[in-house]
């Protein structure tokens, strides 16, 4: 079959839902859905065959089992099969509904018609194969943190979004009134999805610059630093990036970091302190957390 997708079905303990959803998102799956079966959950997700072989899905299954061991919960049962693209599109999109996030956002799937009148900021999204649909706790924590940060005088604020996925965070920043945002992701499919979502939200490319790459490429785009850094990726990657954040920083630069499990928070906090950053707040949701940080004053 051309344009085939892996349909991944996982039978799991309900307390594993968030960690499995996070793992699937980071792996590169799209359209995660959930249904209840007795005392268990059935989680389904989809991954493009062009990117993943059966061995890759087997490795994912092992990661899910290891995550369950860490959480001291029963191991999930994972099955997968190939389906064609038409089946994939209809299978997951029917499960995704508009989602309110924080006080100001409502995330609207691209294939649904948004309301003509609402007091919410409508963020339209078609994530494609990229991470970021607005349903995961880490994405919601980041959007809520941006809402707080940009509640006053956002018109001069410049944002850097590292590991931007679908572009949901940088798009959210622009909708909240930020002057400009730079978004980078190492995945070309994520870059493509983010650019399509930029167009979907009628944002000019000069206001939201989206490029393939990581912090190195971002530094080439930004010559005089940014006011805010947002980063919702794996904790291990964040730890590697923190020593370079100062290259992006202005004296009053702040940051929003998530994709971090609670048990990983101490390692993040220690690295931030070593590199001259202060943890201003730590928001928690289920087993996830979101750091709000600011640059420590120079002695």
From Swiss-Prot:
Catalysed reaction, written as an equation: L-lysyl-[protein] + 3 S-adenosyl-L-methionine = N(6),N(6),N(6)-trimethyl-L-lysyl-[protein] + 3 S-adenosyl-L-homocysteine + 3 H(+)
Compartment annotation: Cytoplasm
Keyword ATP-binding: no
Presence of keyword Transferase: yes
GO cellular component, one term: cytoplasm
Keyword set, alphabetical order: Cytoplasm, Methyltransferase, S-adenosyl-L-methionine, Transferase
Top EC class, one word: transferase
Biological processes annotated in GO: methylation
GO MF annotation: an example: protein-lysine N-methyltransferase activity
Enzyme Commission number(s) from the entry: 2.1.1.-
Binding sites annotated in the UniProt record for S-adenosyl-L-methionine: 139, 163, 185, 232
SUPFAM superfamilies found in the cross-reference section: S-adenosyl-L-methionine-dependent methyltransferases
Function summary: Methylates ribosomal protein L11.
NCBIfam families: prmA
Family: Belongs to the methyltransferase superfamily. PrmA family.
Protein name from the UniProt record: Ribosomal protein L11 methyltransferase
């Amino acid at each position: 079959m051309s344009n085939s997708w892996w349909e991944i079905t996982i039978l799991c303990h309900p307390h594993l839902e968030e960690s499995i959803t996070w793992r699937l998102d980071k792996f590169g799956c799209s359209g995660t859905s959930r249904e209840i079966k007795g005392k268990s959950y059935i989680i389904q997700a989809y991954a493009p065959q062009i990117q993943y072989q059966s061995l890759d899905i087997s490795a994912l299954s092992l990661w899910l089992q290891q995550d369950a061991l860490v959480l001291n919960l029963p191991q999930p049962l994972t099955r997968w099969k190939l389906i064609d693209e038409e089946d994939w599109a209809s299978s997951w999109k029917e499960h995704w509904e508009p989602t309110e996030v924080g006080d100001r956002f409502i995330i609207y799937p691209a294939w649904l018609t948004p309301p003509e009148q609402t007091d919410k900021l409508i963020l339209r999204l078609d994530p494609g194969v990229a991470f970021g649909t607005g349903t995961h706790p880490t994405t919601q924590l980041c959007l809520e943190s941006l809402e707080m940060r940009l509640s006053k005088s956002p018109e001069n604020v410049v944002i850097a979004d590292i590991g931007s996925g679908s572009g949901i965070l940088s798009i959210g920043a622009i909708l909240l009134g930020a002057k400009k945002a730079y978004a980078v992701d190492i995945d070309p499919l994520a870059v493509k999805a983010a650019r399509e979502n930029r167009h979907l939200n009628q944002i000019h490319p000069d206001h939201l610059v989206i490029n393939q790459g990581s912090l190195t490429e971002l530094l080439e785009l930004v010559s005089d630093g940014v006011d805010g850094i947002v980063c919702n990726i794996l904790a291990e990657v964040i730890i590697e990036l923190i020593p370079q954040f100062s290259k992006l920083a202005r004296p009053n630069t702040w940051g929003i970091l998530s994709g971090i499990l609670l048990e990983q928070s101490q390692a993040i906090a220690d690295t931030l302190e070593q590199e001259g950053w202060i943890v201003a707040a730590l928001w928690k949701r289920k087993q996830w957390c979101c750091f709000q940080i600011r640059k420590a004053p120079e002695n």
